[in-house]
Amino acid sequence: MAVKVEYDLKRLRNIGIAAHIDAGKTTTTERILYYTGRIHKIGEVHEGAATMDFMEQERERGITITAAVTTCFWKDHRINIIDTPGHVDFTIEVERSMRVLDGAIVVFDSSQGVEPQSETVWRQAEKYKVPRIAFANKMDKTGADLWLVIRTMQERLGARPVVMQLPIGREDTFSGIIDVLRMKAYTYGNDLGTDIREIPIPEEYLDQAREYHEKLVEVAADFDENIMLKYLEGEEPTEEELVAAIRKGTIDLKITPVFLGSALKNKGVQLLLDAVVDYLPSPLDIPPIKGTTPEGEVVEIHPDPNGPLAALAFKIMADPYVGRLTFIRVYSGTLTSGSYVYNTTKGRKERVARLLRMHANHREEVEELKAGDLGAVVGLKETITGDTLVGEDAPRVILESIEVPEPVIDVAIEPKTKADQEKLSQALARLAEEDPTFRVSTHPETGQTIISGMGELHLEIIVDRLKREFKVDANVGKPQVAYRETITKPVDVEGKFIRQTGGRGQYGHVKIKVEPLPRGSGFEFVNAIVGGVIPKEYIPAVQKGIEEAMQSGPLIGFPVVDIKVTLYDGSYHEVDSSEMAFKIAGSMAIKEAVQKGDPVILEPIMRVEVTTPEEYMGDVIGDLNARRGQILGMEPRGNAQVIRAFVPLAEMFGYATDLRSKTQGRGSFVMFFDHYQEVPKQVQEKLIKGQ
């Protein structure tokens, strides 16, 4: 059992480890857990036994899919590590982990520098204002180059990297690390990296070490006037002053300290842990988060364990032993096991049965989780990702939720046997609850079950999990593009549903104004009824009728998005009006409005990055143009070229195979969803004809 750390917010670090798909992030996390004493044998990813990757698919594919939270201890500090996936299809996982962590380690492959997915992760960290340090990993690999990492961080990320360490030896002779802040060097006495030896800086590295120490002092002087004065007078600042200044610059998002090592060869990981303690923020170092009261007033929430409870649910997982786990971060107050909480997002009361602190695959039960801490709750039934929990009697605030990107790819799925039918719908519902970017719907015309997700890999993994975890066999159709429909001009319509045939009639009558909204706005409903021309209790029914009818647009039956509907007039009948009648009136009105509003089809546009040797560049660009791509730019990367483009998803199916044959297997690409846009006229006609 590791030492218990007395609760002290200053000594808490909530960090994520983020990276491009093969930069060695899971290995780095593994090593951190090994050195902090929570794992007794190191698991290698390429042997398929890493601790953080605890779903079977991850072990097979060697990629990390679900963000697990793991607690470990280092130098009297508690470190909660939120593991984040590096594959593009799982960006929601990265988004939601960024939302609840305070700092991050971004891992780069030293032989590759900054890769496309690292840029995505970096942009997400910028968006959530997460301070970060960088780890140049794989320093023992052929082609490893610290300066490539530094240069690409400046050029591609616009970062201000600060060299904190220099390597001793390079590639396969990489044998130690120079700490330029403390002017000390370290080498390793054994392969496990547990025997670190401090040595004097080798003669041949002294000049370089002094040069970078000097540069580091200059950077530190930007954040501390004392250092500035000492620097100008030729005095040497103390180690504590330098650490404090670099810490301040990092937390203020002005600089990114860069550390190096080889996680696989156990070098540099303990020094990286020291850096987490030295330079990444505690919950007290970051600005308080904002919440909204029911009256719409914005309030600040401070990390005070004695304050009112406020927590955010950031992940749901189905656990084979305890059922549903809700991962939360407590922002204020203290959550105790056995207590009741109020979910302000849903307006429901829930009971906290047990609280767990997680290791990657085992767990300890705890009595309470205090402000700043992360853990899992057993017993919550209604709470989903992005919901806010407050104390039963605490002020009702709602914390800003987590943005969920729209799924862009649809696949029809059907059970192989009658027996699988019932199990399939239950299993899909469970998976959709766990992963907000995965949706399940029924095709309005064909009645088929459609699953939608962020990419082909995402859906493959879902189907895989159906088979393994839920023992459901299913046949899957070909992936289809998730088109959307919208209008291009504002319209005014009315919907009247009146039936008077003996007995009780039906009467619902609404007038709505429908306007197009900018891309990505979704749906906005405004109730502008005054003087009770439609009674209050029927308004939700009108909205429901509209939303249901929007599930299937007039052109090709895809959902209608990006519109604002204002309900401004109508009438009702004392006896014959009902919720049903108003629901139908709403749905009739919106159908007519979309027909009249010059409807268009929208398609998902992907941001695509193709890396190809120079000699195939012409072919690759020609091919992207033929796929209706819009080339955004090119840049050399090593001896290859990187082409960036926007390309419609519809044109990207099977691209991997085509690219391989065009570049004789040397080209590679990544793509992620960027935005929806109108399809060209001739494409729209073709889609409508193909119905």
Curated annotation (Swiss-Prot):
Domain tr-type G, residue spans: 10-284
Alphabetical list of CDD domains matching this protein: EF-G, EFG_III, EFG_mtEFG1_IV, EFG_mtEFG_C, EFG_mtEFG_II
Keywords: Cytoplasm, Elongation factor, GTP-binding, Nucleotide-binding, Protein biosynthesis
Disulfide bonds: none
GO MF: GDP binding; GTP binding; GTPase activity; magnesium ion binding; ribosome binding; translation elongation factor activity
Pfam families from the UniProt entry: EFG_C, EFG_III, EFG_IV, GTP_EFTU, GTP_EFTU_D2
Species of provenance: Thermus thermophilus
Family: Belongs to the TRAFAC class translation factor GTPase superfamily. Classic translation factor GTPase family. EF-G/EF-2 subfamily.
Organism superkingdom: Bacteria
Keyword Calcium annotated: no
GO terms under biological process: ribosome disassembly; translational elongation
PANTHER family assigned: RIBOSOME-RELEASING FACTOR 2, MITOCHONDRIAL, TRANSLATION ELONGATION FACTOR G-RELATED
Protein name (database record): Elongation factor G
Annotated binding of GTP, by residue: 19-26, 83-87, 137-140
Function: Catalyzes the GTP-dependent ribosomal translocation step during translation elongation. During this step, the ribosome changes from the pre-translocational (PRE) to the post-translocational (POST) state as the newly formed A-site-bound peptidyl-tRNA and P-site-bound deacylated tRNA move to the P and E sites, respectively. Catalyzes the coordinated movement of the two tRNA molecules, the mRNA and conformational changes in the ribosome.
Subcellular location: Cytoplasm
GO cellular component assignments: cytoplasm
HAMAP family: EF_G_EF_2_B
